[in-house]
Structure formats: C-alpha cells, structure tokens
Curated annotation (Swiss-Prot):
Keywords noted in UniProt: Monooxygenase, NAD, Oxidoreductase
Pfam families: FAD_binding_3
The protein, known as: 2-heptyl-3-hydroxy-4(1H)-quinolone synthase
Sequence similarity: Belongs to the 3-hydroxybenzoate 6-hydroxylase family.
Provenance organism: Mycobacteroides abscessus (strain ATCC 19977 / DSM 44196 / CCUG 20993 / CIP 104536 / JCM 13569 / NCTC 13031 / TMC 1543 / L948) (Mycobacterium abscessus)
Length: 375
C-alpha cells in the first residue's frame, strides 16, 4: 500500500527513524514513548555508511552530524600499546565512520520526526500489540493501525506478548561508560585524535573522540569484574592492567559514570506477525564490537518504510523487508558476537584473529550498504 496509518512504539533510534521515514512517504504516524520525554543515555556512538545514508534519507544528517567527529583510523592495540590491527576509515573511496554524542543523534531524529509531521506522544506506555494492528496501552485504552512498529528495545513488551519465538543470549561481557570533556588525555606515542581499543586479559578500553572536545570511554569487562561493575570504577585496578593509559584514567576520575549494561544478542524466528513489525534492539540486538547497533536500526527502519509503501499490502511489504535486510544484519550480528572471543585467546593469536574478524566486519558493513541502496 502506498500509505496508511502507523503506530510506532519506542522513541529511540529505530523508532524515531521508522516514524520519520513513514511520514515522509505519506503515512500518518503516531509515536509512543513511555518516558516523559525523548532522551537517551549520554554516551558516544559510532555511525557507519549505512547509518549515515539512513540519516540523509530522512533529512536528519545536517543536524545530527553537526560537531560529529571523523577520525582517520580505528586501531586495536595490546595493553602496552602495540598495534594489533588497524581499520582505515574516512579515506577516499573507503568506508566512512563518524562518532558523535548519542543525545545529539536522538535530538536530531526527534526534530526530523516532528518536521515530517509525526505526532510524538511521551508518557504513553504501550503494553501489547496484536496481529490485526491493535495496540493496547497501560491506561486500558487501545487503538488500531494499518501498521504497528515495535521498537521498544531489548526488553520489548510488545515482542514478548506477540508470540514470536526468539533466542536471547545475555552475554558475560558488558560496559561502563564515561564521557571526558576538555583537552584529550595524553597517551605516550599515540595520536589521541584517533580511535583506539586496548585489549588486556578479559578487559578492553575503548577510547573514542566524539567531538572536538569530548571523548567517550567504554570500560568493557565481564559482569563479575568488581573493578568495573558497581557504582564506581576501580581506576587503580584498570591502571595496573593498562599502565600506558594512566593519563586517561586520571582524566576519567570524578566524572559521572554512565550505567553498566550487559551485552545481549537477540534473534527472532520472524521479524513480523500480521501487521506488527519488530525493529531495532527488540529484533536484532547485538554486542557493540562492530559499532552497528544504531546503524542497523536506522538502516532497517528506512528499509521498512520503503517496503511497506511500495508493496500491495502491509504483510507483503513486511515479508519483502525481512528478506532484504535480515541476511546482512544477521551477518553483522554474527561478526560482533564472534568479537567477544578476543578476550579469551592468547595475546599471540589476537593479531591474526582480529585480521580475520576485521575482514568479516568489512564484508558485513559492505553488505549492509548494498542492501540499503537496493531497497
């Protein structure tokens, strides 16, 4: 169908992108966010070509990428700083990757949604949806739509009550996050304006410039690592594991700690049931090792809007959408899930393994771009 009415549940990256993409194709769209305002955790995010193309498609690129950061490379290093693997980005003819503040991205998506005519309803908690397009709310009210998009996150109520079977892996690893403002902390012998990932035993430190003055740090560890899980980071323990990074830990001292999150992987038996589509982390959550969580959500959202608008009916469009987007997104998931293994192999093997996984990452990203362009 060319257009109709859609109810979108979830005011995150996937939900806002889907709502805007549908509205731009002539749909009337109402978006529901259970919180009292559209907001997000204030950390950094990587956006690759597929996400950048989606932002451009919905008119959110200019505002979203204002003050975003483009580094020339991402280098994976041993705990002593030795390079193990390097990915060149933002070079002529190569992959593009920008980093930015997550709240800047959400803000731009929110503005784009309102400009497109989306009705944004905050404090509106959907509790279930059925195959005929009926959405029920915590107030006891309900509404019906031609299309329902369940983009309510990894703990999705709508997905769980829709009856779709799925596999959910709660991983041992997770991350605590810190934003550092001001002059970048000095790392001996390294370009602090590049992205770096340091590996030391079961721990990783991701160092990500996000703007000219703000740097995002992700402290990745197992969920039983007492130096990382809890109300405060034990930065002395991290300094013992990564002595080269003492200036980074000094810069992080006293900064607000963004909540610990365990990494998860979710795969559904199907991405839709009747007139209900499941999108983003609710459908294909993945650990952040290849930086594609947000990109795949935006990529999938724009593809969804195109498929249902260009098909004879909604259910046919949802089938076409899944057939086109699921294979490359699951390839990105698989690559990201395999990246967890780096922490459990001897250091001498990490370089060759990272090379193999890096080639898989490049292949997965390339497929996402091709599929998005063909949608």
């Amino acid at each position: 169908m060319s257009s109709g009415h859609a109810e979108v549940v979830g005011g995150g990256i996937g939900g806002l992108t889907a709502a805007t993409a549908l509205a731009l194709r002539g749909w009337t769209v109402r978006l529901h966010e259970r919180d009292t305002r559209i907001r997000t955790v204030g950390a950094g995010i990587y956006v690759w070509d597929n996400g950048l193309e989606a932002l451009d498609t919905i008119g959110a690129a200019a505002e979203g990428l204002d003050d975003a950061y483009e580094a020339p490379a991402i280098t994976v290093r041993a705990s002593d700083g030795r390079p193990l693997y390097r990915i060149d980005v933002n070079q002529p003819g190569g992959a593009r990757c920008v980093t930015l503040l997550r709240d800047r991205l959400i803000g731009a998506l929110h503005v784009a949604a309102e400009h497109a005519g989306v009705e944004v309803c905050t404090g509106s908690a959907a509790v279930s949806a059925t195959a005929d397009g009926t959405v029920e709310f915590s107030t006891g009210t309900s509404t019906r739509a031609d299309l329902v998009v369940a983009a309510d996150g990894v703990h999705s109520l709508l997905r769980d009550r829709l009856g779709i079977s799925y596999r959910r892996i709660r991983m041992r690893q997770g991350a605590a996050r810190v934003m550092v403002s001001g002059e970048r902390p000095f790392i001996p012998g390294m370009d602090v304006d590049q992205h770096h990932e340091f590996l030391g035993g079961r721990r990783r430190l991701l160092y990500t410039p996000c703007t000219a003055t703000q740097t995002y740090l992700a402290f990745v560890a197992d969920n039983d690592d007492t130096a990382t899980v809890g109300p405060e980071l034990d930065l002395a323990a991290w300094a013992r594991a990564f002595p080269l990074l003492v200036p980074v830990f000094d810069a992080a001292r006293g900064r607000a700690l963004i909540r610990w999150d365990n990494f998860e992987l979710i795969r559904l038996s199907t991405w839709s049931h009747g007139r209900v589509a499941v999108l983003g982390d609710a459908a294909h959550a993945q650990p952040p090792y290849v930086g594609q969580g947000g990109g795949t959500a935006m990529n999938s959202a724009v593809g969804l809007a195109a498929a249902v608008s260009e098909s004879a009916d909604v259910e046919d469009g949802l089938n076409r959408w899944e057939q086109a987007l699921r294979p490359p997104i699951e390839k990105a998931q698989t690559t990201s899930y395999r990246m967890r293994l780096i922490g459990s192999v001897p250091e001498v093997l990490r370089g060759p393994l990272l090379g193999a996984l890096g080639r898989s990452r490049s292949s997965a990203t390339s497929q996402l771009i091709k599929k998005r362009s063909a949608a």
